[in-house]
UniProtKB/Swiss-Prot annotation:
CDD domains associated with the record: EF-G (cd01886), EFG_III (cd16262), EFG_mtEFG1_IV (cd01434), EFG_mtEFG_C (cd03713), EFG_mtEFG_II (cd04088)
Keywords attached to this entry: Cytoplasm, Elongation factor, GTP-binding, Nucleotide-binding, Protein biosynthesis
Record-linked InterPro entries: EFG_II, EFG_III, EFG_III/V, EFG_IV, EFG_V, EFG_V-like, EFTu-like_2, G_TR_CS
Biological process terms in GO annotation: ribosome disassembly
Binding site for GTP: 17-24, 81-85, 135-138
Similarity annotation: Belongs to the TRAFAC class translation factor GTPase superfamily. Classic translation factor GTPase family. EF-G/EF-2 subfamily.
Function as written in the Swiss-Prot or TrEMBL entry: Catalyzes the GTP-dependent ribosomal translocation step during translation elongation. During this step, the ribosome changes from the pre-translocational (PRE) to the post-translocational (POST) state as the newly formed A-site-bound peptidyl-tRNA and P-site-bound deacylated tRNA move to the P and E sites, respectively. Catalyzes the coordinated movement of the two tRNA molecules, the mRNA and conformational changes in the ribosome.
Protein name: Elongation factor G
Disulfide bonds: none
Residue span(s) of domain tr-type G: 8-283
Length: 692
């Protein structure tokens, strides 16, 4: 089966935006006008084709990047829907990785919002060229020019309008195309499928000329030939203007900007035209970097049909009918269904059972997949997100994706014994799908802990356990692993002697207990001389202490960072045994601990908060209230960075509090750093609570 669409007519694009900018509606309209959907799904009634997971239908927010294929004017557009909520930025990063271009959707009223800043930074990080679509022009308070200024100021970008609105709010009827210098007015009767091209209304002619001049000036800078023509006062042709916009868009020195109202079916066709005119084909983006696994040298993979197959797995989903789907972006060569691929990241071969082209939630079996395509592979067992699939003889490992450490953990308990096993399997599957979600067992409590990127992230995981895997689980309060240690040195003796007819028990030890440096652990030193305790009983003393230290004297938490020296003792020829010395060691340690000024330790997290300057005071005040120690403050990309150590126990609910304190514009990350001493008043509360 030969390739249907040449590589230069393929566009892999993502639609990225802040929650509520109208991103899903825009994707829907694209599918509608390109002839995929017949009835438009609305997010408001939960029928959008892109939003195909059940919870998305309820929450009205898009969670997973469904990859959908559609066609427009002889071009194939592979549309990757990205989530717009801060807890799902990992999904956005993951899709940015495989996009060639993006459409950034902004609300004409809300403008540049917090998540849009995060998503914009991610697109910069991966070098993704983009066009801006200012949506919801029909809403009260719509202001296209306001959004233009915010993009300049907040995102430090160079937006260049290529169309401007005719009217706003309920008088918004169409746009002025600044390239053709014509008015485009949509026809309400045909649900926006038809539009008329007219002369520019006289009251908007001045503004249109002013913005056309700005556009021509911006693109003349992109190319010497255009600059000469412009400076010579010659008129640039439509083709030359388009060429200039494309050069600037691809080198990211300018961002073409359009407007419309997806909900009212206006402006979607002009957006699709801009996607194929200005966003890059796979052949127009920088070659992707990789490593040759044999030589460890850097290699570059060019997007082309020639050469051996190479692709990147960027998303794993469990489909109730087909099983596991692995979404792959193909960078080079082609692959037939039923053939074998080599996973160079894992050094394993796997067979691809079927190849599926996804149309939001419908699927089409295809025989082979070519460079530049995005396709779901069925039948891969060992491949995870971020793995490279390629030809074994021409192996390459494409750039790995980086996944952040979870910032929140909660305990999950299955409601019934029957759920226990199902829960383990289900959590394993969810962790395969989502690399930012982790599962572990807490040694001290034996509970299963799940960790993720935020409270909403974990809520959705628990929700999916119930819906997709039919596992009922209770979630606990977030738990903190405290520790105990000692602050002073003490010597103690303990004699364990039991004589009550028959063979007795006898063990007698003298130990010295001393504090050690934080993080240095446990040390046992044997200073017995002259055989006062026989050699074979020494390990039993050590073992007794190690068992006792799992249960500290303050509140039953493990004791850390101390040294025990066994320096004297005595034994009985008949009654001494390993058991007796183990008990003697354990009792001596407990008595010594009580006298050695025991203290409680808690995990201290290294926290980095990134906020706009106006919220800095509030954020620092809040960290101080949480017993944080501020270490440093820096500037980065017009934002303030606060670095601090904060006790983990004080960080629960922080993402929600930070979001409301900074109107969602603050972001933070945290990781475990060290154990620190709990202040005595707080330690007292913890001990009393623990002893109940």
């Amino acid at each position: 089966m030969a390739r249907k669409t040449p590589l230069n007519r393929i566009r892999n694009i993502g639609i990225a935006a802040h929650i509520d900018a109208g991103k899903t509606t825009t994707s829907e309209r694209i599918l509608f006008y390109t002839g995929v959907s017949h009835k438009i799904g609305e997010v408001h009634d939960g029928a959008a084709t892109m939003d195909w997971m059940e919870q998305e239908k309820e929450r009205g927010i898009t969670i997973t990047s469904a990859a959908t294929t559609c066609f427009w004017k002889d071009h194939q557009i592979n549309l990757i829907d990205t989530p717009g909520h801060v807890d799902f930025t990992i999904e956005v990063e993951r899709s940015m990785r495989v996009l060639d271009g993006a459409v950034s959707v902004f609300c004409s009223v809300g403008g540049v919002q917090p998540q849009s800043e995060t998503v914009w930074r991610q697109a910069n990080k991966y070098g993704v060229p983009r066009i801006v679509f200012v949506n919801k022009m029909d809403r009260i308070g719509a202001n296209f020019y306001n959004v233009e200024n915010q993009i300049k100021q907040r995102l430090k970008a160079n937006p260049v309008p290529i169309n401007i609105p005719i009217g706003a709010e309920d008088t918004f009827i169409g746009v002025i195309d600044l390239v053709q210098m014509k008015a485009i007015v949509w026809n309400n009767e045909t649900m926006g499928a038809k539009y008329d091209v007219e002369e520019i209304p006289s009251d908007l002619l001045e503004r249109a000329k002013e913005y056309r001049e700005k556009l021509v000036e911006a693109i003349a800078e992109q190319d010497e030939a255009l600059m000469e023509k412009y400076l010579g006062g010659e008129e640039l042709s439509v083709e030359e203007i388009k060429k200039g916009i494309k050069i600037g868009c691809l080198n990211m020195s300018l961002v073409p900007m359009l407007c419309g109202s997806s909900f009212k079916n206006k402006g979607v066709q002009t957006l699709l035209d801009a996607v194929i005119d200005y966003l890059p084909a796979p052949t127009e983006v920088v070659d992707i970097k990789g490593i040759d696994p044999k030589t460890e040298e850097e290699v570059f993979v060019k997007s082309s049909d020639d050469g051996e197959f190479a692709g990147l797995a960027f998303k794993i989903m469990t489909d109730p009918f087909v099983g596991q789907l692995t979404f792959v972006r193909v960078y080079r060569g082609k692959l037939e269904s039923g053939s074998y691929v080599y996973n160079s990241t894992k050094d394993k071969k796997e067979r691809v059972g079927r190849l599926l082209k996804m149309h939001s939630n419908k699927r089409e079996d295809i025989k082979e997949v070519y460079a530049g395509e995005i396709c779901a592979f069925v039948g891969l067992k060992d491949t995870l997100t971020g793995d490279t699939l390629c030809d074994e003889k021409n192996a390459v490992v494409l750039e790995r994706m980086e996944f952040p450490e979870p910032v929140i953990h909660i305990a999950v308990e299955p409601k019934t014994k029957a759920d226990q096993e199902k829960m383990g399997v289900a959590l394993g599957k969810l962790a395969e799908e989502d690399p930012s979600f982790r599962v572990m067992t807490q040694e001290e409590t034996g509970q299963t802990l799940i960790g993720g990127m935020g409270e909403l992230h974990l809520e959705i995981i628990v929700d999916r356990l119930k819906r997709e895997f039919k596992v009922e689980a209770e979630i606990g309060q977030p738990q903190v692993a405290f520790r105990e240690t000692i602050r002073s040195s003490v010597s103690k003796e303990h004699k364990y002697a039991k004589q009550s007819g028959g063979r007795g028990q006898y063990g007698h030890v003298f130990i010295k207990l001393e504090p050690k440096e934080p993080g240095s652990g446990y040390e046992f030193v044997n200073e017995i001389s002259g055989g006062v305790i026989p050699k074979e009983y020494i390990p039993a003393v050590d073992k007794g202490i190690q068992e006792a230290m799992q249960n500290g004297v303050l509140a039953g938490y493990p004791v850390v960072d101390f040294k025990v020296t066994l320096y004297d003792g005595s034994y009985h020829d008949v009654d001494s045994s390993e058991m007796a010395f183990k008990i003697a060691g354990s009792m001596a340690f407990k008595e010594a601990s009580r006298a050695a000024n025991p203290v409680l330790l808690e995990p201290m997290m290294k926290v980095e908060v990134e906020v706009p300057e106006e919220y800095m005071g509030d954020v620092i005040g809040d960290l101080n209230r949480r017993r944080g120690q501020i270490n440093s403050m820096d500037d980065r990309l017009g934002l303030k960075i606060v670095n601090a150590f904060v006790p983990l126990v004080e960080m629960f609910g922080y993402s929600t509090d930070l979001r409301s304190a900074t109107q969602g514009r603050g972001t933070y990350s945290m990781e475990f750093d060290h154990y620190g001493e709990v202040p005595s008043n707080i330690a007292k509360e913890i001990v009393e609570k623990r002893k109940g």
